[in-house]
A protein has these predicted regions:
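Phosphate-ester processing/binding pockets and catalytic centers
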Residues: 1-219
Length: 219
């Protein structure tokens, strides 16, 4: 960060939009911009991080559930949190680790909601109907308790929160455009969960692209 005199967290949306703490990028020539983005990716590649997410297409979610549940639909974040934590926990089990869940701090209300979701996983297991989720092999409450080590909120300036933010956008875009360059780079460099598990396990253990029924994924 010192080389570029960066004095703010590495937030993906600000970097891509060249706004707020990264507005100076707009004043640099193309070669300088490309050098910055390449060095940023080198950082992402070098750290011992594996990308995994739950990505929900909002139009697809509304199309699938609005008529059936109207305003009683679950918050998207409950679905995303539960699935992402469970899949990370399953991988942690495979490699013999326990899992720390370290969400980025937001505000008191939303922070409390996430902590509640975490507690529900350890008390009750996954919140989905058994008949529709059985084939995913959901973890039991006991398995969650054995695998989840702690829940701790992190500030936006936390290195782990910044890395999670940088990884999230390419993983999201990969659901819509398989050839998205940052997504392809992470994939080719073995930085995604799919690179560490057999292809037949992707449906249950890889990044979950949920409610993508209406999405025509570009190659």
């Amino acid at each position: 960060q010192a080389k570029w005199d960066i004095r703010c967290p590495l937030h993906s949306s600000e970097i891509r939009g060249q706004t707020d703490g990264f507005h100076w990028l707009a004043d640099r020539d193309k070669a300088d911009q490309e050098r910055f983005y390449e060095q940023l990716y080198v950082l992402m590649r070098a750290v011992p991080v594996i990308g995994l997410a739950c990505v929900i297409d909002r139009p697809g979610y509304n199309h699938r559930y609005k008529e059936r549940y109207a305003n009683e639909r679950w918050s998207l974040c409950k679905t995303a949190f539960s699935i992402a934590v469970e899949r990370a926990a399953k991988y942690a089990q495979q490699v013999g680790y326990r899992l720390r869940v370290l969400p980025e701090r937001c505000n008191k209300l939303e922070d409390s909601v996430l902590k509640t979701y975490y507690g529900e996983l350890t008390a009750n297991g996954m919140p989905f109907a058994v008949d529709t989720s059985e084939h995913y092999g959901p973890l039991s409450p006991e398995e969650f308790r054995k695998t989840l080590y702690e829940f701790k909120l992190k500030s936006k300036s936390s290195p782990m929160a910044q890395l999670a933010d940088l990884y999230l956008w390419p993983i999201c875009m990969g659901g819509y455009h398989a050839g998205n360059r940052p997504y392809e780079q992470l994939k080719s460099d073995g930085k995604l969960i799919e690179c560490l598990i057999p292809e037949q396990a992707w449906e249950n253990l890889g990044t979950k692209y949920s409610c993508f029924d209406l999405v025509q994924r570009n190659p």
